[in-house]
Amino acid sequence: HTGGELHEFLLVWSLLTVALLYVPGSLVSGLLYIGMITWYAGVYRTGSWHTVQHPWLYLPMLAVVIPAYVRELRRNGSSTGFFWFNAIAAISIAIGSQLFWFDGHLEVALGIMGLAVAFCLVPLTYRSRTVRTGAWPFLGGIAVLGVLFFLSYHDIWTEIKREPGDHLGPDIWPLITMLAIGIVTYVLALRWRKPMQATWFPESLVIVLVAYGLAYVSIPVATVIINAWLLALGLHTVITGLHLDSLPRMNLGLAIISVTIALRFFDLDINDALKGVVFIALGIGFLFMNMRLLKQRKMATHA
């Protein structure tokens, strides 16, 4: 009874799968359902390049899975299955949230940052540390860094000067929604987390909003703020990694600093040999810091 389009087929099967979320209510049916509605939303949005179609049905279909998610959280919050449930849900929301823009704007980065910060703070909404929610901050952290690196280029900010203030049109609504999600989540998280406690990733939303406001006055100032924040974020991550004796976290901080420096060197018209020297120096820095942490571990073991 469908018209033969793929998105119609996926919609029908998604609706047929809804009952399996609660009878018998298996975890596999939840994973299948989330995957189906995400596929449907993507196909519906990209099915035509001539007309813009937004997958509005994706939103109520996503809401249907919330009771099943809460049930699995209470029953199997520390299980591997729930980890994958979280991972698929996070990926679905990350993809689905980007299907409601009419056009590409600088402000899209602000919306992505808002949602990314909310992802980073998801683990704080659970009192139990045994709940496996690692997929949310992982994806959120990637998105935060992606937006910061994107905004670290001077030319990106010139769109503010080219376009009038009302150029967003209908895109203002998904922008406001995603920003509101990030701001509300950040404010609610203050009950359990002080500003800049443990990680500085959530504060990136504040920095980006400040830089966006200042860009209307001075684009170079906005660019400097983003680059300075990237270096500070990387340095803090390195220090935290050393303090916690964590190689992955320390290397993440080194990577943030190195990528920021490398990107700025690509902006400069300098000799390729000098660029090569810089990359070698960055590699030596990675090696030195890793050897330092390993030595620190060895000394702690013999102490």
What are these regions (language model features)?
Residues 1-303:
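Alpha-helical multi-pass membrane segments and their bilayer interfacial helix-loop junctions
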